[in-house]
Structures are given as C-alpha cells and as structure tokens.
Regions:
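Short catalytic/metal-binding and nucleic-acid-binding patches
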Residues: 1-185
C-alpha cells in the first residue's frame, strides 16, 4: 500500500490504491427494474466481466439484479481507472437495454458507490455479502442457486479454507447501503 494514495476530489474522497480490493455498488435511476428479464441480467454480467477485464480489474465476486449490482475486484496498478471503467460499463449496458426497449438516450444508471477494502475481515465480510445478496432479497434460498452472481462458482471452486473464512465473516457497521427490492423473475 502506498503512503499517499491518489485521490479523486469527491465527498467523501475516493481513494485509489494500487492492487487493492474495492467493493462497488451501482443503482439504476429511480431503482427502476431495467434488468428484470434473464437475458438482461446475462447482458449485465457479461458486460461486467468484459469491462473489468479490459481495465485490468480482477473480479473476486459479483451479483447483478434487476435494479442494481455489487462487485468486488482487485484494482490494477492504476486504480484511478475505476471511474472510466464504470462509465464504460454503464454506457454499454444502458445502450443495450435502451436498444431492447426501442428508446434512445434514456438514463439507466443513477450512480455508483465504491469502498476500498483494506482489511481481511472487511474483504471476507463483503464477499459474504455480495454472494448472499440474492438470498437477502429472497430471490433464492441458497446463494449458489442464483445464476447472475459468482456464488455458485465460489462454492464449487474456492479453497475450502477461504470458503469457511467468508462464511464465518460477520457483517459490520460499514456494510453497504442496500435498500433495493429486485423484481422477482
């Protein structure tokens, strides 16, 4: 970790620390359910995988819903690429959804929130949170049943010790704000 992380002038300030874990949450405008159908959720997941790879962000966990998403990723050496990466993701998915709905220029995304995860406990708690978000929203009974997130892969492929650490991680007061109500599919 650098002694003086790069900052983006924002309130609260955004920290850009190379090779650090970040959690990002984004919401659609007015929490509208633009991604309610399965094909739209697939579109959102595929775009997230594509865009994070293009910017050198290593995805650790993700979950996409009808009106929001969460992801955790490790930043590249230039962590300040977060903003243009999110702008590209939002632009690409908004254009695609607008094309599907036969409209142009409609705003789809409202904004995003990012958190720099600087402790192992925070990282494990957020992994747990992202993977279990579909359960929280009562879309599935077990996280690995939700096809639009990484929980199934994590359950099948992650080292058992890591799975146990994540499972045991307790949410804390800095848990992400999430008052979304995804549409039932």
């Amino acid at each position: 970790m650098k002694d003086h992380p790069q900052r983006w002038p924002h309130r609260p300030p955004h920290l850009f620390i190379p090779n650090t874990m970040y959690m990002v949450t984004a919401s659609t405008i007015y929490k509208q359910h633009f991604f309610k159908a399965a094909d739209r959720l697939v579109l959102c997941c595929e775009a997230l995988l594509e865009v994070t790879a293009a910017y050198g962000w290593e995805l650790q966990a993700w979950a996409a819903f009808s009106n929001h998403y969460h992801f955790i990723a490790q930043s590249p050496e230039d962590a300040s690429t977060l903003k243009p990466m999110i702008q590209r993701l939002h632009s690409q998915t908004a254009r695609a959804v607008n094309r599907l709905d036969g409209v142009s220029g409609r705003q789809v995304w409202f904004q995003y929130w990012d958190t720099c995860l600087r402790t192992d406990q925070s990282y494990y708690a957020r992994l747990n949170y992202v993977h279990n978000n579909a359960v929280k929203h009562r879309l599935v009974q077990a996280a690995e049943q939700y096809p639009y997130c990484s929980a199934g892969w994590f359950t099948s492929n992650a080292d058992i010790a890591l799975r146990e650490q994540v499972k045991a991680a307790t949410p804390h007061s800095t848990e992400p704000h999430d008052d979304f109500t995804p549409a039932e599919g």
